[in-house]
Amino acid sequence: MENIILIGMPLSGKSTLGRELSKILKYDLIDTDTLIEEMEDKSIKEIFKIYGEDYFREKELKIINKLKKESNKVISTGGGLPIYNKNIYELKKIGFTVYLKVPLEELIKRMVKKEDDARPLLKNDDTKFLEEMYKNRIEIYEKAHTIICNTNYEESLIAIVKAYKKWKGI
């Protein structure tokens, strides 16, 4: 499958870079959180509040199964999608996985700066929770095909496209 799958912590830039990558490569963009919101006709925050995290993770599994039939897509995942149910291995079968590795200090800055109601697991004052999440997830994220360690937007795009072309043998 020739998809690019962006994984990483909340606030790592998956959605933003995904939009630009899809334009550059002329691939359709799929945002897994947006798909779930459309399926449920509710925001992620509402889904968590009404049905709980387990229900949300089941929906993510359904999305992964649908994605197995897709090609030439840029897929931006929710931060937890690769973590649960060993989904990272399923994602690697679907396409080229890219871990957008952002230093914890930068994620904390972004969290404090961005008051975002859409992220049910993050509150703008909960740096301890973010630190714990980072520690618990990093090992799985690092199983991606490539790791982009860059907070510069343009350089990240260039690095992703280069790594993807190398993976494809172009």
Swiss-Prot record:
Annotated binding of substrate, by residue: 33, 57, 79, 137
Chain positions recorded as ATP binding sites: 11-16, 119
Pathway annotation: Metabolic intermediate biosynthesis; chorismate biosynthesis; chorismate from D-erythrose 4-phosphate and phosphoenolpyruvate: step 5/7
Domain of life: Bacteria
Chief location: cytoplasm
Subunit structure and binding partners: Monomer.
Descriptive protein name: Shikimate kinase
Species: Clostridium botulinum (strain Loch Maree / Type A3)
